[in-house]
Structures are given as structure tokens and as C-alpha cells.
């Protein structure tokens, strides 16, 4: 494995630091984030971003005595002279643009090499999750639900990046930047601090975090390929693929005592690995102790190689028929439908029990209500409340905002096998919309509905998304009937709904 890592890291890039002073780098970042207005300058600079100010900020960072600055300093201090958080976004955007350039070039060159594509031929796009759930899950028996741990300190992310990029001034400046903005005086960076940094510098943080995930996944793929490509050895049992030669003789002796015969070979099952955001699942058809082996690999990999502490309770192995796992904002499990069939052969009659596995994909109502309560559409009990911050808009805009949220949820959860459970969410949004309109007109809900006659208009909240297909297919069409009965996955749902993203 060490040889593999050294070979993969041999393609390192130099001289990234001078790019931080190139004006076109910040021009690219400005064009990419124009609507976010993070490059608008402070008062007195004519509301334009300036490379000169960025250079001055970099110079001040080098001249500042870091032993004087406290981690609890206010957003404005003598070091900056301006808004600290505001200009940190400017520099972090420049960091993200610069550091993405060599990896984009490396990816482009790698795609041209046939052996790279052949090596990663089992990797799939994120959109392949949907056919995986539909086609594979009913044939699997065990699932391991894993939450990927966050690094305890951002220095770990920087060290991982150092394996790939050799540029001492660049990393010196990177540490200097993180020291000023991420409370590096603390031995352990709290999850709250990381969350604050990720929200204020989303592009830069996502690059560091995704690079950390990509690094451990590349090692996992390497171990998986090595374990599945071993030749069959007679009269041997291989549970551990790492250092298995030393354990071969001992394992054979142990199993010879416990069983009346010796196994010829114990082959690993095909492991399905799926990751989305900060969670991943391992699914397998065979015995759970092999799943437990891979879970131990993950724990040791995170703790020993990445210095990331992960508690064993963050990894759970459960039968799919008894446990629901959360992925893509859904609760999914495999339900066993049992039926008894009467059969007769000659004069003998007997009963046959048939077990059919069916994939259940359920809408997580309680987490959705928590998300709506956090967004101030209802309270924690699911009782709809008004949205006063929208009361200044016109009636049409208020209704349109609520309808877009409701249709987005319906669009997202069209893959559910029980769409009627969404009626409660639609009712909360509908009643919150009515209360917001009544609050705007300074009236009660009943008086507002009686005066404006808006009840028929608000029935759009309960319009099913499949009804749109009735405009394309005839009402008696078999295609339309299948659309109402089956699940429909839309490929754009990975980006459309912020309420259901895994945290």
C-alpha cells in the first residue's frame, strides 16, 4: 500500500504561491460569485473589488505578531482595519481557485489514460444511487450505516494536501490564513468552529473536506481490489487480507479443530459502497462479520493514517429487514412480504410460504418537521405559524414562495413508495401561507379566507406532481397509471432541496 500511495502522489505541483497575486485569479472568483457580493469592498472603495487590497491584506498577515492576537478578537481590529470575516472570504476564494487548478489539470490528464479508467471501472456517478436502490437493495441482507468523521483540527486537512502539492510558501501562507480565521490556538477545533468556517468559506472548505474524503476512499478502493483479486488457495481460510500470510497456518489449525472438514476457500462477498455528503453505507448479502471486518478497516484507517478519531458507535451493522437507514433524505429498508400458496401434487396437498422482498423508501416526516420549524414555518410540534418576514411582499409573491417550497418537496420525494405521508407537510405549508397572508392584512385566518376567497387557490398545495403528466398522456393511458403507481426519481433532486441534506 505504501508503494501505491507513493506512486499516486508522485505527480505533485509546484509554484502555486505566485498565483495568489495574479489579478485574473480573483477575477475568476468574482465572476463565479457575483451574485453573492462577497467581493464588494468596504465603505470608501467605490464598491469594487481590488487586487491591491488583497495584496495589502496578505502583507499585513505576514507583518502581524500572532502571539498578540487573541482567538476571541472582534471582527474589526488593528490588524485588519476592516471587516475581518468579509476579507477572509476574499482570500479564501482566491485559495480555492488557485488550489483547484493543478488538480483539474491532473484529472484531465488522468482521464486520457486507459489504465486509470480501467482501475476505477467500478466507480459510478452519484446519480447511480437511484438504480442501486431499486435493483440491488432487495438482494442484500446487511447494511452498515457510517457517518464520516470530521477532522479534529484543520491542520490535518492541510497535511493531507501537502502529500500532493510541494510549495512551501503556499502552505506557509495557508497556515497563516487559517491561524487568523479558524482559532488555531485551540488544540482541538470544535465542530461549531468548523461549521462557521465552512459557511463563511464554502468553496475552500468543501475542497479541503472532499480531498480528505477522496484520499481515504482511494485507499479503500485499493484494499478492496487487493482483497478481491487474490488467487484461490486450497485448504486455507483468509479472513484478514492484510498480513494474511502470517495468519494462514494458524487459521487453518483453528478451523480444523472446530469443524469436521477444512474449508477450501472463504471468499469475500461483493461489497457495495455508496457515499453521499458526510455519510456512506456498506451493503452486503452475506454474513455480518465480514462487514465488521471492513468497519474495523475504516476505524483504523481514520485513526492511524488521518489522525481522525471515530467512535465505534458511529458505525452500525443491521439487517435490512429490521433496520431503516437514512440516505438522500429518505428512510429506506427492505420489507418482507409473506404469502402462503396452496399447491397440489398428485393426491398430496401442501402449503408453501413465499417470501418476497420489497424495497420501502419512506419520507422522514419528523426530520422534515424539524427542518420546517428551524426555518420558522411551524413550531416543534408541527403547528403552522406565520412568516412575518415575508409579509411585506405581495399576495402573489407570498403564495408563489410557499408553492415553490411545496412543489420542491413533492418533486424530491417522488421516489417514495408512500407519497401520501407528505400531506402533513403540505398542510403545514398551506396553513403557514394562510396565516402569513392574514398577518399581512391584519385579519384572522377565517375572516381572510371568507373575504378573499383564497381557499380554492390554495388547493394547489395538494396537487400531485404526477398530475402534470395528465397533460401529456391520456387519462386512460396505461403509462399514466404506471406513473401514479411507481416511484419516479428525478436526477436534479441532489441540488434542489436544502431541507433534506444530511448534516
From Swiss-Prot:
Keywords from the named record: Chloroplast, mRNA processing, Plastid, RNA-binding, tRNA processing
Family: Belongs to the intron maturase 2 family. MatK subfamily.
Biological source species: Vicia villosa (Hairy vetch)
Role this protein plays: Usually encoded in the trnK tRNA gene intron. Probably assists in splicing its own and other chloroplast group II introns.
GO BP annotations listed: mRNA processing; RNA splicing; tRNA processing
InterPro entries membership: Domain_X (IPR024937), Maturase_MatK (IPR002866), Maturase_MatK_N (IPR024942)
Compartment annotation: Plastid, Chloroplast
Pfam families given in the database record: Intron_maturas2, MatK_N
UniProt GO cellular component terms: chloroplast
Keyword check for tRNA processing: yes
Record-given protein name: Maturase K
Keyword tRNA processing annotated: yes
Amino acid at each position: 500500500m505504501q508503494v501505491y500511495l507513493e506512486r499516486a502522489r508522485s505527480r505533485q505541483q509546484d509554484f502555486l504561491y505566485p498565483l495568489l497575486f495574479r489579478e485574473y485569479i480573483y477575477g475568476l472568483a468574482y465572476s463565479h460569485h457575483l451574485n453573492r457580493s462577497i467581493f464588494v469592498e468596504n465603505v470608501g472603495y467605490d464598491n469594487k473589488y481590488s487586487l491591491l487590497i488583497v495584496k495589502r491584506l496578505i502583507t499585513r498577515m505576514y507583518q502581524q505578531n500572532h502571539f498578540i492576537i487573541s482567538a476571541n478578537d472582534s471582527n474589526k481590529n488593528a490588524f485588519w482595519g476592516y471587516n475581518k470575516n468579509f476579507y477572509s472570504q476574499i482570500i479564501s476564494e482566491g485559495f480555492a481557485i488557485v488550489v483547484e487548478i493543478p488538480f483539474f489539470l491532473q484529472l484531465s490528464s488522468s482521464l486520457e489514460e486507459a489504465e486509470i479508467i480501467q482501475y476505477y471501472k467500478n466507480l459510478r456517478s452519484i446519480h447511480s444511487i437511484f438504480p442501486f436502490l431499486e435493483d440491488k437493495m432487495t438482494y442484500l441482507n446487511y447494511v452498515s450505516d457510517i457517518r464520516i468523521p470530521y477532522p479534529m483540527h484543520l491542520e490535518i486537512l492541510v497535511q493531507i494536501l501537502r502529500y500532493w502539492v510541494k510549495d512551501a510558501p503556499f502552505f506557509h501562507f495557508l497556515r497563516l490564513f487559517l491561524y487568523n480565521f479558524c482559532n488555531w490556538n485551540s488544540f482541538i477545533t470544535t465542530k461549531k468552529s468548523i461549521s462557521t468556517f465552512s459557511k463563511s468559506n464554502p468553496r475552500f472548505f468543501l475542497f479541503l473536506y472532499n480531498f480528505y474524503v477522496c484520499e481515504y476512499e482511494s485507499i479503500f478502493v485499493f484494499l478492496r481490489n487487493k482483497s478481491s483479486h487474490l488467487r484461490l488457495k486450497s485448504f486455507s481460510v483468509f479472513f484478514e487480507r492484510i498480513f494474511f500470510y502470517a495468519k494462514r497456518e494458524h487459521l487453518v489449525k483453528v478451523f480444523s479443530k472446530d469443524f469436521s472438514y477444512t474449508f477450501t476457500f472463504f471468499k469475500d462477498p461483493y461489497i457495495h459502497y455508496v457515499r453521499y455528503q458526510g455519510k456512506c453505507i456498506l451493503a452486503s448479502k452475506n454474513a455480518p462479520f465480514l462487514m465488521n471486518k471492513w468497519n474495523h478497516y475504516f476505524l483504523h484507517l481514520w485513526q492511524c493514517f488521518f489522525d481522525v478519531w471515530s467512535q465505534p458507535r458511529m458505525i452500525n451493522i443491521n439487517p435490512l429487514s429490521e433496520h431503516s437507514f437514512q440516505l438522500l433524505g429518505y428512510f429506506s429498508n427492505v420489507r418482507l412480504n409473506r404469502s402462503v400458496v396452496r399447491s397440489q401434487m398428485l393426491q398430496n396437498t401442501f402449503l408453501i410460504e413465499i417470501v418476497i422482498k420489497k424495497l420501502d423508501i419512506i419520507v422522514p416526516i419528523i426530520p422534515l418537521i424539524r427542518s420546517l420549524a428551524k426555518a420558522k414555518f411551524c413550531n416543534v410540534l408541527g403547528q403552522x405559524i406565520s412568516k412575518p418576514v415575508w409579509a411585506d411582499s405581495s399576495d402573489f409573491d407570498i403564495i408563489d414562495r410557499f408553492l415553490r417550497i411545496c412543489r420542491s418537496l413533492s418533486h424530491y420525494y417522488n421516489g417514495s413508495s408512500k407519497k401520501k405521508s407528505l400531506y402533513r407537510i403540505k398542510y403545514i405549508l398551506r396553513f403557514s401561507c394562510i396565516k402569513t397572508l392574514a398577518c399581512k392584512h391584519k385579519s384572522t385566518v377565517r375572516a381572510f379566507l371568507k373575504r378573499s376567497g383564497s381557499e380554492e387557490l390554495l388547493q394547489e398545495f395538494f396537487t400531485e406532481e404526477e398530475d402534470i403528466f395528465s397533460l401529456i398522456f391520456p387519462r386512460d393511458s396505461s403509462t399514466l397509471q404506471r406513473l401514479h403507481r411507481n416511484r419516479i426519481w428525478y436526477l436534479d433532486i441532489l441540488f434542489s432541496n436544502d431541507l433534506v441534506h444530511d448534516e
